[in-house]
Amino acid sequence: MARSIWKGPFVRESLIKKVNKLIESGKSSVIKTWSRESAIIPLFVRFVFAVHNGNKFIPVVITEEMVGRKLGEFAPTRTFYGHAADRKVKRK
C-alpha cells in the first residue's frame, strides 16, 4: 500500500541537513546514508549519495528522473549469480 498523498514523501531530517550544509559550503562530497526508505526530492539532484545495501555503500548520483523514488531502489541488496547449470552427464 502506498503512502497517502496528504502526508507527503518521507525524507530523513539528517539527509536534508547534510545537503543544506553542502549547499552552504559550496563543496561536493559523498553523503553516506543508511536511510534507504527516504524519498528523493528535487533538493537532492546532482548530489552523490552512498546508500548502504546491507554489506557496503553503493554510490548513487541523483538525477532529475529519480525524483519521487526511494534511495534504496538504486542500491540492490541481492546478488544474482545465475541459475545452476545442468550437471547431468550427456552420453552419445
UniProtKB/Swiss-Prot annotation:
It comes from the Bacteria. One of its GO terms (biological process) is translation. GO terms for cellular component: cytoplasm; small ribosomal subunit. InterPro entries: Ribosomal_uS19, Ribosomal_uS19_bac-type, Ribosomal_uS19_CS, Ribosomal_uS19_SF. Pfam families: Ribosomal_S19. Protein S19 forms a complex with S13 that binds strongly to the 16S ribosomal RNA. HAMAP family: Ribosomal_uS19 (MF_00531). Belongs to the universal ribosomal protein uS19 family. This is Small ribosomal subunit protein uS19. It comes from Orientia tsutsugamushi (strain Boryong) (Rickettsia tsutsugamushi). The gene is rpsS.
